[in-house]
From Swiss-Prot:
Gene name in the database record: MT-CYB
Residues binding a ubiquinone, per UniProt: 201
Functional summary from the UniProt entry: Component of the ubiquinol-cytochrome c reductase complex (complex III or cytochrome b-c1 complex) that is part of the mitochondrial respiratory chain. The b-c1 complex mediates electron transfer from ubiquinol to cytochrome c. Contributes to the generation of a proton gradient across the mitochondrial membrane that is then used for ATP synthesis.
Classification lineage: Eukaryota, Metazoa, Chordata, Craniata, Vertebrata
Originating species: Lepilemur microdon (Small-toothed sportive lemur)
Predominant place of localization: mitochondrion
Protein name: Cytochrome b
UniProt membrane topology term: Multi-pass membrane protein
């Protein structure tokens, strides 16, 4: 009698996706981030569910309810900080996952890549709305500033902002709808993850060499389940160290002050994982231009497959492209640092130069380098 996992209608799907899945034998630890993102999403949904049981989405009681969770609910402080720092881990894995896709040319798997970009936007939207919920100073003013950016769109801008706010300013209606959306979006993200995996398993995984693995594959279990488990242990070590030793390291002290519409904080800034995009937004003096640059800073990933004329899929054997890739990483770290600094010299100039370099690398320099490398290899 054959194994039930290979015949049962439901178990068969799980088996073909996670157990008997034919996998390239040479994928490195950088391919772990997909499963780590799945783990992060699971942690966020579970901790979020428990937080939602005690949270009240009302402007008068939201801040108090978060305080109540931390002080009075059994292990509420742990659940709250695992959720908050879990978001940071989520984005850490996301950036590494996208970076690996760029480095090893995974963007050639178009459907998987495009669903991934939709996922990235969805996770960013979810994280932004989650940051508003504690209703501290930075929550309130962050929501006001970021939603107000939509008013830059001609003709419909103001109506669009008031429609999102549910009034003429950020208030009870805004908080309620943000909570509703923050609750439902992770489940939509889970569905998108399944579509992401469906498209990936249509073509099979890429590998560091960028060559076809069809002639030589190994089952996912036990090889990569073990490897992923090691990655998960390291992720949990980092998350638990953050949560139990430095819970507020990545947060903003202003968020421990209840929201006050009459008092603006000296420096309004989002969480660290949005700072690179925030720096690009601030580097352009024009409001609409800044908003367009902000959106394009992520949306540019969608046109990467069109801009890459390289004959070799990965950067593994292309030293010039590797050098530019690490310059891009350094540039993004610079933008992240600038996003957290006040708007004054020399930070304004550094931010503008880093923004120009970011778009130049993506649109001109890296594709041109690919052409040079093709020429050097006589391809």
């Amino acid at each position: 009698m054959t194994n039930i996992r290979k015949n049962h209608p439901l178990l068969k799907i799980i088996n073909n996706s996670f157990i008997d899945l034919p996998t390239p034998p040479n994928i490195s630890s950088l391919w772990n981030f997909g499963s780590l993102l799945g783990a992060c999403l699971t942690i966020q949904i579970i901790t979020g569910l428990f937080l939602a049981m005690h949270y009240t989405a009302d402007t008068t009681t939201a801040f108090s309810s978060v305080t109540h969770i931390c002080r009075d609910v059994n292990y509420g402080w742990a659940i709250r900080y695992i959720h908050a720092n879990g978001a940071s881990m989520f984005f850490l894995c996301l950036f590494a996952h996208v970076g690996r896709g760029l480095y090893y040319g995974s963007f050639t798997l178009l459907e998987t890549w495009n669903v991934g970009i939709i996922l990235l936007f969805s996770v960013m939207a979810t994280a932004f709305m989650g940051y508003v919920l504690p209703w501290g100073q930075m929550s309130f003013w962050g929501a006001t500033v970021i939603t107000n950016l939509l008013s830059a769109f001609p003709y419909v801008g103001t109506d669009l902002v008031e429609w999102i706010w549910g009034g003429f300013s950020v208030g009870k209606a805004t908080l309620t709808r943000f909570f509703a959306l923050h609750f439902i979006l992770p489940f939509i993200i889970s569905a998108l993850v399944m579509i992401h995996l469906l498209f990936l398993h249509e073509t099979g995984s890429n590998n560091p060499l960028g060559t076809s693995s069809n002639s030589d594959k190994i089952p996912f279990h036990p090889y990569y389940t073990t490897k992923d488990f090691l990655g998960l242990l390291l992720l949990m070590l980092l998350l638990m160290t953050l949560t139990f030793f430095y819970p507020d390291l990545l947060g903003d002290p202003d968020n421990y002050t209840p929201a006050n519409p009459l008092n603006t904080p000296p420096h309004i800034k989002p969480e660290w994982y949005f700072l690179f995009a925030y720096a690009i937004l601030r580097s352009i003096p024009n409001k609409l231009g800044g908003v367009m640059a902000l959106i394009l800073s992520i949306l540019i990933l969608a046109i990467i497959p069109l801009l890459q004329p390289n004959k070799q899929q990965t950067m593994m054997f292309r030293p010039l492209s590797q050098f530019l890739f690490w310059i891009l990483v350094a540039d993004l770290l610079t933008l992240t640092w600038i996003g957290g600094q006040p708007v004054e010299d020399p930070f304004i100039n550094i931010g503008q130069m880093a923004s120009i370099l970011y778009f130049s690398l993506m649109i001109f320099i890296m594709p041109m380098t690919c052409l040079i490398e093709n020429k050097m290899l006589k391809w």
